[in-house]
Amino acid sequence: KRLLKDLSIEINQVIPEGGSVENLRQLPKAWFNLVPYREVGLMTAKYLEKEFGMSYISITPMGVVDIANCIRQMEERINIMSPILLNRRVNYEPYINEQTRFI
């Protein structure tokens, strides 16, 4: 959650955390799904992709390389929707560079 907060990405739902029927109805409002642990949410993400056309990212954001790859995937997904809905694009490379500068 901290990574998404750092990137100013609003979280729609975290499932199964707080998984009420009302919360589950909100799932299709997300621009994409992040599946940080394939063992837990991959089947749900595949279902949402099939039923609602929602893309998903299934990179586990652990370690410098995978965190950077995950952020770049999120940037790509956001930049597909953001210019249409918010009339702007995001660039997370400065964040990646700042986080990995001394590694």
UniProtKB/Swiss-Prot annotation:
Its cofactor is [4Fe-4S] cluster. One of its GO terms (molecular function) is ATP binding. One of its GO terms (biological process) is light-independent chlorophyll biosynthetic process. Keywords: 4Fe-4S, ATP-binding, Chlorophyll biosynthesis, Chloroplast, Iron, Iron-sulfur, Metal-binding, Nucleotide-binding, Oxidoreductase, Photosynthesis, Plastid. Pathway: Porphyrin-containing compound metabolism; chlorophyll biosynthesis (light-independent). It catalyses: chlorophyllide a + oxidized 2[4Fe-4S]-[ferredoxin] + 2 ADP + 2 phosphate = protochlorophyllide a + reduced 2[4Fe-4S]-[ferredoxin] + 2 ATP + 2 H2O. InterPro entries: ChlB/BchB/BchZ (IPR050152), Nase/OxRdtase_comp1 (IPR000510). Its EC number is 1.3.7.7. It is found in: Plastid, Chloroplast. One of its GO terms (cellular component) is chloroplast. Binds 1 [4Fe-4S] cluster per heterodimer. The cluster is bound at the heterodimer interface by residues from both subunits. Protochlorophyllide reductase is composed of three subunits; ChlL, ChlN and ChlB. Forms a heterotetramer of two ChlB and two ChlN subunits. Component of the dark-operative protochlorophyllide reductase (DPOR) that uses Mg-ATP and reduced ferredoxin to reduce ring D of protochlorophyllide (Pchlide) to form chlorophyllide a (Chlide). This reaction is light-independent. The NB-protein (ChlN-ChlB) is the catalytic component of the complex. Belongs to the ChlB/BchB/BchZ family. PANTHER family: LIGHT-INDEPENDENT PROTOCHLOROPHYLLIDE REDUCTASE SUBUNIT B. This is Light-independent protochlorophyllide reductase subunit B. It comes from Bazzania trilobata (Greater whipwort).
